[in-house]
């Protein structure tokens, strides 16, 4: 139903599959139209811009029955400074044995800082999976956009060693608390 120009409640005929209801302004009947810009409600869609689903105090903003995350798998050994671009993947998996302790640097991408990408009060959670050989190494420093950050570690103790002949999975939750200000929660789990 909608309120027409004479303030009379009027009912609209049912729509056709694949159409969306579009307002025509106050007092005018809404119309069923094909979605603009090639967006189809019954086909796969890709968005490159930010989509906001705000929900309310009594409704969830988003409910997912299933979802996939992008995982970058690389035959690379963890060592030196590793740039983790959060716009590229949620999970980064290095399949060659780590060869030294490393720094992980979180950023949006090579051209966008994490500080620019995120708004205050937003968080992102990512995982870095590191293959370990008989000599194990560990993540000994964290930076965001090249600036040092001291994480808060699960259990309260910073990483001091890796786990030999395993896959160590590091999970980081990064919370933006202010301009270029972040809280990082870090944990590590051994898989063998």
Predicted regions and their residues:
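Predominantly extracellular/luminal regions of secreted and cell-surface proteins
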Residues: 60-93
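Extracellular repetitive beta-rich solenoid segments
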Residues: 2-58, 66, 85-88, 96-102, ...
């Amino acid at each position: 139903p909608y309120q027409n120009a004479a303030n009379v409640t009027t009912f609209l005929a049912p729509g056709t599959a694949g159409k969306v209801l579009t307002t025509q302004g106050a007092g005018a009947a809404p119309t069923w139209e094909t979605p603009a810009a090639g967006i189809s409600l019954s086909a796969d869609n890709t968005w490159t811009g930010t989509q906001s689903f705000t929900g309310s105090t009594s409704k969830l903003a988003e409910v997912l029955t299933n979802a996939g995350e992008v995982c970058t798998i690389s035959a690379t050994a963890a060592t030196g400074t590793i740039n983790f671009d959060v716009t590229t993947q949620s999970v980064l998996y290095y399949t060659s044995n780590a060869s030294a302790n490393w720094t992980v640097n979180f950023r949006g991408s090579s051209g966008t800082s994490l500080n620019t990408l995120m708004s205050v009060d937003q968080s992102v959670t990512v995982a870095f999976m590191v293959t370990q050989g008989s000599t194990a190494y560990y993540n000994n420093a964290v930076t965001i956009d090249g600036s040092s950050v001291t994480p808060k570690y699960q259990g309260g103790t910073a990483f001091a060693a890796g786990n030999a002949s395993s896959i160590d999975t590091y999970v980081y939750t990064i919370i933006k608390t202010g301009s270029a200000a972040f809280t990082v929660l870090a944990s590590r789990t051994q898989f063998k």
